[in-house]
């Protein structure tokens, strides 16, 4: 198994406020570990940001199939500030799982995510 460290970034997103935009989809035959994520406000006023994990893979817990969950929900980010989520924690993505980003204002949050893909 090969372990490949990568950075996934998007200068501004989402294209439309209220419509989450895909940042990353775990490729086929790959397990991805999210190592960290930073969201930066590039707007002239405070924004709120949401990060979702969209998963339909087999569940190992209460449900037979995983569902969409929030990693961050409507968190305020002040002007010129950034917000680090998952500080010290990891999230595992299976093939087809997605990370989606939303913001209260279109194209006003910049996102950087560090990952490790295991193939």
Where are these regions (language model features)?
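C-terminal interaction-tip segments
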Residues: 1-32, 95-96, 102-119
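Short gly/pro-enriched beta-turn/loop segments at secondary-structure junctions
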Residues: 32-34, 46
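Short solvent-exposed strand-capping/beta-turn motif centered on an Asx-Ser/Thr pair
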Residues: 39-44, 104-106
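Acidic glycine-/aspartate-rich tracts in secreted/extracellular proteins
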Residues: 42-45, 56-58
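Beta-strand signatures of extracellular beta-sandwich domains
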Residues: 50-54, 112-114
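Short edge-strand/loop segments of extracellular domains
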Residues: 54-59, 118-119
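Intrinsically disordered, low-complexity Pro/Gly/Ser/Thr-rich segments with frequent PxxP/GP/PP motifs
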Residues: 57-98
């Amino acid at each position: 198994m090969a372990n490949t460290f990568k950075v996934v970034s998007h200068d501004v997103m989402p294209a439309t406020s209220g419509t989450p935009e895909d940042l990353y989809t775990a490729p086929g035959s790959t397990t991805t570990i999210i190592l960290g994520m930073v969201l930066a406000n590039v707007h002239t006023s405070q924004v709120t940001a949401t990060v979702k994990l969209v998963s339909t893979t087999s569940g190992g817990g209460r449900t037979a199939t995983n569902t969409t969950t929030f990693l961050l929900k409507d968190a305020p980010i002040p002007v010129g500030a950034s917000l680090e989520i998952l500080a010290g924690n990891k999230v595992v993505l299976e093939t087809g799982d997605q990370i989606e980003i939303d913001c209260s204002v279109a194209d006003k949050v910049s996102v950087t995510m560090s990952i490790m893909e295991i193939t």
